[in-house]
């Protein structure tokens, strides 16, 4: 153990004090201050006179016993910070604890009379580290891991931590069975230093032996072995085993992965290793739901089968009813059906293939759409933070939208039918379009924010995605165009800037979106391929898709060929489960390739969060800052919009 010659301890002793007396003795505490804020905090957190004052009242003799216990506890704290000649004094109503009359004085008091407790410190000189020695053969690189310097303050936590660092360094250098004893420290009172010695038995460098895998139920062992980052014969490194453990957990099919080494090497001098694996449930059923004042209510169910073939592949099916409840930007109930099948490690490690099918029907102010979609994509993970994907998509859809104002343009873009019945809220004629779209999506993602799940609550990091999709529209109308979108979000923990006291509880978040559709005019682009703004994904406070070019005179959205949008959001947690946010969104949509040519719209608002195990439950209220009213538009922007869902807005 870490100690010096003589009788003193360096570890904080915790225990419960004896309690005597029937009536609690009320008291208040004044504790002296040192020049070290960390030491002050530790002293206050260790003193039971302070920490138990309200939660565990005591009688007069219990108070004396608690104070005597604090003498030893606080002395141990001071020594652990390097003050080995320090003293602690505690008085109760100016009487020292060894005063024989103290107990009688307290018992004769009225039960309502508060007692004054004072804690004072005499730190004495600060001890420093003297010699730092290692008993045993240790490689220079491992010895450097101690990170101790002669002359530095003799802080116990630093010395104990150095022993742990030395052990880890040896085990990461092939010494699987390295042993580092607790450091031994000897005081030199004359020079006010502690001389520290570490006793080490490193043993021999050893390779990995047999690697056993246990606990599998549905998964095939061959899948796990292909994923392993370590193999028999590799030099033993503790960090490599930990990396292999984390990699297996990241596959999403294991709930727990533990790694153990045998207590002794095998007859060949190797280190046998066991991966103890617990699989996640193979079947998962979930329900989803959301509400916004512009899109109404959506409700759905999803089902996932993990490891269909025992190789980590997954099949996911989902079905949702959307636009329930008459949102202000919708005109009827729709549906969204989808299925996805994903195969990990396709052809090579860290490369997956995903096949998807879907069906969608929705009726929006901008257009009515009925579509069947399909796609296949190959996702390649280049590193921990970089990934790329390439794929092929095919879509067959029918879209109904108001007719372009120019009749010749209307015919040129494939307006095959003039719909007799106008859309609710407008008397303008509408066109029916039939599209067959083939796309080649290419995507690159940089992610240090850890946003693997859409419900993740990011607190720091950056995520940037660039998507380029050449698209071919077959038949009539025919078109070729390329849609490019750059999206990004950044998260800054204000505690790192010294603007908050607790990590992860005060976060400043930013979101940005830019997009261009090149190669086709505004109306030759299929309506669902154009850009729109407004709603929770772009500019809160405005109806879904309502920002951008619009038909005259009814003001229904047309969509544009360029977009830019951005958000600044402050997130603050309160207590254990609650939080609030404030935000400002801004953006515009253009009918040309100049993303800045449209009218900038801004929205602002606030919301509350309730944090659950699945993610934060979100309720946001936003207002348009430059609200449009007649005669600028036929239909005014609503005074506010409400958004409810699971997960942060981004």
Put a short name on every predicted segment.
Residues 22-38, 51-293, 297, 314-335, ...:
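Periplasmic polypeptide-binding modules associated with outer-membrane biogenesis and secretion
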Residues 1-9:
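Bacterial N-terminal signal peptides that target proteins for export
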Residues 272-280, 287-304, 381-382, 390-391, ...:
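Extended beta-strand-rich architecture
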């Amino acid at each position: 153990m870490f100690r010096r010659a003589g009788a003193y301890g360096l570890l904080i002793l915790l225990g419960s004090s004896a309690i005597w007396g029937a009536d609690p003795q009320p008291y208040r505490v004044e504790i002296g201050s040192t020049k070290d804020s960390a030491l002050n905090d530790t002293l206050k957190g260790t003193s039971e006179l302070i920490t138990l004052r309200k939660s565990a009242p005591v009688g007069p003799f219990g108070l004396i016993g608690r104070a005597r216990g604090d003498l030893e506890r606080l002395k141990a704290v001071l020594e652990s910070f390097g003050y080995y000649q320090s003293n602690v004094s505690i008085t109760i109503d100016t009487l020292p604890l060894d005063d024989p009359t103290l107990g009688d004085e307290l018992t004769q008091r009225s039960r309502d009379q508060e007692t004054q407790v004072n804690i004072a410190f005499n730190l004495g000189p600060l001890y420093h580290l003297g010699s730092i020695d290692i008993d045993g053969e240790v490689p220079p690189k491992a010895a450097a891991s101690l990170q101790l310097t002669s002359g530095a303050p003799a802080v116990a936590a630093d010395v104990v931590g150095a022993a742990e660092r030395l052990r880890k360094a040896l085990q990461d250098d092939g010494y699987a069975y390295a042993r580092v004893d607790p450091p031994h420290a000897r005081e030199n009172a004359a020079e006010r230093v502690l001389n520290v010695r570490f006793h080490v038995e490193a043993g021999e460098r050893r390779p990995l032996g047999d690697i056993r895998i246990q606990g599998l139920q549905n998964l095939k062992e061959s899948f796990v072995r292909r994923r392993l980052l370590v193999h028999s014969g590799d030099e033993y490194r503790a960090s490599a085993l930990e990396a292999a453990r984390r990699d297996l957990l990241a596959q999403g099919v294991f709930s727990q992965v533990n790694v153990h080494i045998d207590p002794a090497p095998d007859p060949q001098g190797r280190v046998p290793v066991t991966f103890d694996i617990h699989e996640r449930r193979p079947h998962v059923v979930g329900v989803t739901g959301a509400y916004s004042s512009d899109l109404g209510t959506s409700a759905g169910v999803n089902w996932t089968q993990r490891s269909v073939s025992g190789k980590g592949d997954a099949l996911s099916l989902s079905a949702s009813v959307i636009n329930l409840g008459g949102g202000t930007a919708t005109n009827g109930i729709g549906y969204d059906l989808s299925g996805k099948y994903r195969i990990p490690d396709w052809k090579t490690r860290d490369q997956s293939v995903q096949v998807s099918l879907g069906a969608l029907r929705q009726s929006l102010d901008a257009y009515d759409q009925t579509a069947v979609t399909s796609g296949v994509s190959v996702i390649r993970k280049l590193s921990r933070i970089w990934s790329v994907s390439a794929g092929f998509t095919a879509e067959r859809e029918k879209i109904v939208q108001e007719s372009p104002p120019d009749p010749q343009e209307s015919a040129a873009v494939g307006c095959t039918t003039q719909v007799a019945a106008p859309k609710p809220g407008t008397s303008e004629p509408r066109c029916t379009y039939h599209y067959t779209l083939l796309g080649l999506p290419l995507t690159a993602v940089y992610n240090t924010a850890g946003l693997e799940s859409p419900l993740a609550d990011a607190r720091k990091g950056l995520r940037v995605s660039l998507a380029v999709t050449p698209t071919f529209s077959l038949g009539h109308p025919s078109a070729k165009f390329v849609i490019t979108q750059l999206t990004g979000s950044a998260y800054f923990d204000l505690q790192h800037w010294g603007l908050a006291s607790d990590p992860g509880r005060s976060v400043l978040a930013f979101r940005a979106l830019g997009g261009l559709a090149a190669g086709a005019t505004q109306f030759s682009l299929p309506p669902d391929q154009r850009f729109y703004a407004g709603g929770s994904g772009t500019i809160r406070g405005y109806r879904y898709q309502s920002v951008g070019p619009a038909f005259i005179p009814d003001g229904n959205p047309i969509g544009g060929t360029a977009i830019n949008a951005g958000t600044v959001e402050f997130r603050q947690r309160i207590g254990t489960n609650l939080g609030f946010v404030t935000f400002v969104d801004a953006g515009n949509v253009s009918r040309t390739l100049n993303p800045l040519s449209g009218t900038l719209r801004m929205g602002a608002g606030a919301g509350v969060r309730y944090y659950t195990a699945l993610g934060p439950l979100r309720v946001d209220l936003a207002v348009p800052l430059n609200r449009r009213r007649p005669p600028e538009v036929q239909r005014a922007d609503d005074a506010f919009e409400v958004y409810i869902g699971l997960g942060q807005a981004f």
